[in-house]
């Protein structure tokens, strides 16, 4: 995939709207903010389709989990792959190698730093919004031109 991918995922209770700008996006946040709900909605849609009550727009969006993650990932192309924080394989060198060698975008839900992956500080988000409507908000704001953050001096 190349470029931005705008995604909307909704059901009767929740609506998530966000844009992925690069191949790796990290979603962080406190408990109860809706990260796992988002993941579960996507997984339900993958398993049940329309019967899940979930609507997805923005391309092929899938969840990746379990022992067979490598085989499942090898089958995917030009997809948005969503991984929940319980998936230990995201810390492996094998996963990092697979990410480098494919054309998918990844949305990884984690509170941990993933040192083996190259991702931008600008692509770390949290979920903001109350009630039904939620969107991603950039976690790290920086002003490289200010004296306080000018690391080149």
Regions found by a protein language model. Give the residues of each.
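Hydrophobic anchor at the beta1->P-loop junction of P-loop NTPases
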Residues: 27
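Conserved glycine(s) of the Walker
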Residues: 33-35
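Post-Walker A alpha-helix
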Residues: 38-40
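Sensor-1/coupling segment of RecA-like P-loop NTPase cores
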Residues: 99-128
């Amino acid at each position: 995939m190349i470029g931005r991918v705008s995604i909307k995922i909704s059901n009767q209770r929740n609506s998530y709207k966000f844009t992925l700008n690069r191949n790796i996006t990290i979603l962080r946040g406190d408990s109860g903010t809706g990260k796992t709900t988002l993941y579960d909605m996507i997984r339900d849609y993958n398993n049940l389709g329309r019967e899940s009550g979930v609507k997805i727009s923005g391309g092929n969006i899938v969840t990746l989990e379990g022992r067979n993650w490598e085989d499942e990932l090898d089958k995917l192309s030009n997809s948005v792959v969503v991984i929940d924080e319980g998936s230990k394989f995201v810390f492996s060198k094998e996963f990092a190698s697979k990410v480098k060698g494919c054309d998918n975008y990844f949305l990884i839900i984690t509170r941990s730093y993933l040192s083996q992956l190259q991702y931008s500080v600008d692509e770390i988000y949290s979920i903001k919004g109350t009630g039904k409507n939620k969107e991603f908000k950039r976690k790290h704001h920086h002003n490289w031109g200010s004296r306080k953050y000018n690391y080149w001096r």
